[in-house]
Amino acid sequence: MDVTRLLLATLLVFLCFFTAYSHPPPEEKLRDDRSLRSNSSVNLLDFPSVSIMALNKNSKQISRKEAEKKRSSKKEASMKKVARPRTPLSAPCVATRDSCKPPAPACCDPCASCQCRFFRSACSCRVLSLNC
């Protein structure tokens, strides 16, 4: 009988704490639009003002030159990145670094051989000797 009363008292205290801490405090409650507008206008006045300055001719010319340099460097980089189209390989061989599991044909490169790893689950054509 004493154990059940102790258990019920503990449960009652837990529920009281849970209900007290589940509700937000009064200052965290949602406010209406009027109070939000008044608070936002007060907060904006606290920040320093932003000044806008006109650019002189020299700074405009420098910025234009920098922009042109960036454009030309981007064009050069795009020209350098153009990849050569791959030549189609003949069908009865496997290209270097491609999968070459045992039913596949031999490697196209005469210096390459088929290497398998992880109990022949991952096989690829690799060049073993550079002197070939």
Curated annotation (Swiss-Prot):
Domain of life, per lineage:
Eukaryota
Claim: tRNA processing is one of the keywords in the record: no
- The set of disulfide-linked cysteines is C93-C108, C100-C114, C107-C125, C111-C132, C116-C123
Where do transmembrane segments lie in this chain?
none
- The main location class comes to secreted
Q: Which UniProt keywords apply?
A: Disulfide bond, Glycoprotein, Knottin, Secreted, Signal
Compartments reported by the entry: Secreted
Q: Provide GO CC annotations from the record.
A: extracellular space
Q: Where is the composition biased (Basic and acidic residues)?
A: 63-79
Where are the residues of the annotated region Disordered?
60-88
Against PROSITE patterns, the record matches this protein to: AGOUTI_1, AGOUTI_2
Glycosylated residues (UniProt) = N39
Supply the Gene3D superfamilies for this chain: Agouti domain
Q: Know anything about its domains from the record?
A: The presence of a 'disulfide through disulfide knot' structurally defines this protein as a knottin.
Protein role: Involved in the regulation of melanogenesis. The binding of ASP to MC1R precludes alpha-MSH initiated signaling and thus blocks production of cAMP, leading to a down-regulation of eumelanogenesis (brown/black pigment) and thus increasing synthesis of pheomelanin (yellow/red pigment).
Q: What is this protein called?
A: Agouti-signaling protein
Species of origin reads Macaca cyclopis
Report the gene name.
Answer: ASIP
